[in-house]
UniProtKB/Swiss-Prot annotation:
Gene3D superfamilies: 3.30.230.10, GHMP kinase, C-terminal domain
GO MF terms, alphabetically ordered: ATP binding; homoserine kinase activity
Name of the protein in its database record: Homoserine kinase
Main location: cytoplasm
């Protein structure tokens, strides 16, 4: 018996919702933009093999890999429930660039924990599993935030509420929006991107942030796409993180002049996103970004839609 789970890329913050808003995305051409994890019956308590395009960027030691730590916390939770942990042989297919702003660590965490849970016949419920995912994300980034793991696991656009035992809630979005995702091929560690932010903000920035986020959520629920797009503004992180992203300002300006409804930094960068409601505009922006924002062979551009499913089983073998 074995199971393979795919976990999609995600946009943390979506510009307007620092640490509280996230969206899962998948390319419209059907290609997989995310990590996969296989869990199979093992002869030892735990073994891990790593494959994929970005396997060279992973720690050499198994004990330093986040998938190993996912197994440890999963074992801890099963022990609390007096449920037997099965010996497992795990394989991580690392397709996501690390430090990309696409929720790379979340992809590995979500795929690993979802696959472990399915392999053990779902002993943990959705909220319990999501809490573990947040714990693992905090281990990597240094702070607890669900804006990548929640959409990666649950799909769609997710708003983090973290009250009444509820971690996140889905937000209705717009079916005709395309999301152009451009990764330049350089690395921006989340911890470094957080360190550059100020410890205090001006009152007018706090007011603006509340207005934009409240306006965006309201516009999504009332299905006003033009208003929602106007609200996608970041006064918390983008003004400070721009300096870490070569060419971002010019790329955003081009995207907006070319017809994008909104454009911003995905997560802590360096990936940027541009929202379009016209496929030809999205493709034109994608071509320009490939020529002008991508810096090396590791970079890429995808025209995406929101991934409404989140993590999912893709078979029993990689």
């Amino acid at each position: 018996m074995s199971v393979v789970v795919y976990a999609p890329a995600s946009i943390g913050n979506v510009s307007v919702g620092f640490d509280v808003l996230g969206a899962a995305v998948s390319p419209i051409d059907g290609s997989l933009l995310g990590d996969r994890v296989e869990v199979a019956a093992g002869e030892q308590p735990f073994t891990l093999k790593c494959v994929g395009d970005f396997v060279a960027k992973l720690p050499v030691e198994q004990e330093e890999n986040i998938v190993y730590h996912c197994w440890l916390v999963f074992a801890r939770e099963l022990d609390k429930k007096n449920i037997e942990l099965k010996p497992v042989s795990m394989t991580l297919e690392k397709n996501m660039p690390i430090g990309s702003g696409l929720g790379s660590s979340a992809c590995s965490v979500v795929a690993a924990l979802d696959a472990l849970n399915r392999f053990h016949n779902l002993p943990l419920n959705e909220v319990e599993l999501l809490a573990l995912m947040g714990e693992m994300e905090a281990k990597i980034s240094g702070s607890l935030h669900y804006d990548n793991v929640a959409p990666c696991y649950l799909g769609g656009l997710q708003f983090m509420v973290q009250e009444l035992g509820i971690i996140s809630q889905p937000v209705p979005c717009f079916d005709d929006w395309y999301w152009v995702m451009a990764y330049p091929g350089i690395k921006v560690p989340t911890a470094e991107a957080r360190a550059i932010l100020p410890s205090q903000y001006r009152r007018q920035d706090v007011i603006a942030h509340g207005r934009y986020l409240g306006g965006f959520i309201h516009a999504c629920h009332s299905q006003q796409p033009e208003l929602a797009a106007k609200m996608v503004k970041d006064v918390v992180a983008e003004p400070y993180r721009e300096r870490l992203l070569p060419g971002f300002s010019n790329a955003r300006q081009y995207a907006l002049e070319a017809g994008a409804l909104a454009s911003g930094i995905s997560g802590s960068g360096p990936t940027m996103f541009s929202v379009c409601n016209d496929l030809e505009v999205a493709k034109r922006i994608a071509r320009w970004l490939e020529d002008n924002y991508v810096q090396n062979d590791e970079g890429f551009v995808h025209v995406c839609r929101l991934d409404s499913t989140g993590s999912k089983v893709t078979g029993s073998e990689l």
